[in-house]
UniProtKB/Swiss-Prot annotation:
One of its GO terms (molecular function) is S-methyl-5-thioribose-1-phosphate isomerase activity. The active site is at D255 (proton donor). Pathway: Amino-acid biosynthesis; L-methionine biosynthesis via salvage pathway; L-methionine from S-methyl-5-thio-alpha-D-ribose 1-phosphate: step 1/6. Keywords: Amino-acid biosynthesis, Cytoplasm, Isomerase, Methionine biosynthesis, Nucleus. The keyword Isomerase applies. It comes from Drosophila willistoni (Fruit fly). Pfam families: IF-2B. InterPro entries: IF-2B-related (IPR000649), IF-M1Pi (IPR005251), IF_2B-like_C (IPR042529), Initiation_fac_2B_a/b/d (IPR011559), M1Pi_N (IPR027363), NagB/RpiA_transferase-like (IPR037171). PANTHER family: METHYLTHIORIBOSE-1-PHOSPHATE ISOMERASE. Its main location: cytoplasm. It comes from the Eukaryota. GO terms for biological process: L-methionine salvage from methylthioadenosine. This is Methylthioribose-1-phosphate isomerase.
Amino acid sequence: MSLQSIKYNRGSLEILDQLLLPVQSKYVAVRGVEDGWKVINKMQVRGAPAIAIVGCLSLAVEIYPEEFESKKSLRQEIEGKLNYLVSARPTAVNMKIAADELLSLANDLTKAEDVSVPDMKQRFLNATEAMLQKDIADNRAIGANGAQAILKRVATTLGAAGTSGNGSVRVLTHCNTGSLATAGYGTALGVIRNLHELGKLEHVYCTETRPYNQGARLTAYELVHEKFPATLVLDSMVAALLRAKNVAAVVVGADRVAANGDTANKIGTYQIAVVAKHHGVPFYVAAPLTSIDLQIPSGDHIIIEERPDREMTHVGEHRIAAPGINCWNPAFDVTPASLITGIITERGVFEPQELKEAITKLLGL
């Protein structure tokens, strides 16, 4: 059974504090938008899908007990709080897309003469809560689509590397993209989970993912919890791993995908893609449609969040870097579309060059 990172009942929200894992499993109450902003910004909750869900549900928790004099005052409250939540971690596009959708709903309900203030509030709460279940369903579809894409590629490639006699595969993933990064099941880790369910996962390798160690702390925690055949490797071992272990595919998540397929993901993703290209290993990005930003033409336009120096210089309270050294700590890098084999979504797997046209048709834009 997969881990539960988000616990929600109407009026109540708790998140599993990911800063304490794997040593301690502790749920933290999120009582409103200010709490939501803090747990996102401090990375007590992380992963682009989970950020959006926790952000929106924190607003639902805050407005649930409140009474509003007018629909206009409710709409103003919604708009201001959503804009604030988007600022918590700006690289992940899911929160911005969710905020835009909810604000659009609030605007429509404000204009509707047959909708009362209580009705508007109820419909808004329903919409935020629906995101939770939709994310789980989308993740399962991503998992199935990605697993089939990998297995199909292996089956059609003569003498494919990374496979055993029964067609099982060895895969590599980076950062954390599982139940802890989503409402449940996962994106890239959802693909791996689906391979395991099909009996086609021979082995999964996960990187430590410095400096926050999401791979060592979180992905490894999930893999051990679910008893997957798994091995942790250092970030600096990826080239040696792909050379020595015959990995069939690399699968990573995404915080934002540009219209041309350029992908912003956890720092270190770009160099893994370069190494995968050199070794002829397919490199897949697994992401829901909400992570694809067609308004951004390329990765050059993606804002990259920079984190505090302390995250590099300390482990917990212990300094590991020489005092006085300067640090550069971008949380993400951008992998060029030319290095990406396919982008796995809940609606199918697309090559980067066909992404914009395909998504535009799917969404009827």
